[in-house]
Amino acid sequence: YENKQNLGWCSAFDYYKQAEKNSIYNTPPVFAIYTTLLVLRWMQNEIGNLQNMEKINNQKAALLYNVLDEIYQQNQFYIPQVPEKYKESRSIMNVSFHLQNAEITQKFLQQAEQQAKLFGLKGHRSLGGIRASIYNAMPLKSVELLADFLRDFWNKNK
């Protein structure tokens, strides 16, 4: 601490002062830190490493985009938010798409919940449509269930 310089920082970022007083300026976000610990342990024990997580996430996204693109090419029943020709710009965490109108979109959301127990698919309020959030903790089996539902709903409503 001998070379301490007063840099004019606010006291929350003056780590010299905190170390000197053997105290911290504020309480750290302990719940967020604990949750992060649990997620990192899960990733280490179940997934192995970040490269494996990336492979799994790419696999989940590809599964949904392949179904959407295949059906779009046949009759444009599902309309991906980002077209296939721009697939390098597609999100692997949020797969967004539209149906042909608000009525069929509402029917899709209702049947997804009632028949397949798929919840939280309603798109962002400013964009509408459907948004499947397939973040790290979403198992591949759940994404497969959604892909099956997409095909089944299309077959019954095309």
What label would you give each PLM region?
Residues 1-65:
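Active-site C-terminal subdomain of aminotransferase-like
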Residues 20, 91-95, 128-130:
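Short amphipathic alpha-helical segments
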Residues 36, 95-98, 134:
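Short, well-ordered beta-strand elements within core beta-sheets of diverse protein domains
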Residues 45-47, 65-84:
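PLP-dependent aminotransferase class I/II
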Residues 75-111:
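Conserved PLP-binding catalytic core of the aspartate aminotransferase-like
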Residues 107-115, 145-151:
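Short amphipathic alpha-helices in soluble, non-transmembrane regions
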Residues 110-126:
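Short glycine/proline-rich, acidic loop/turn segments that cap or connect secondary-structure elements
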Residues 124, 128-158:
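PLP-dependent enzyme catalytic core of the Aspartate aminotransferase-like
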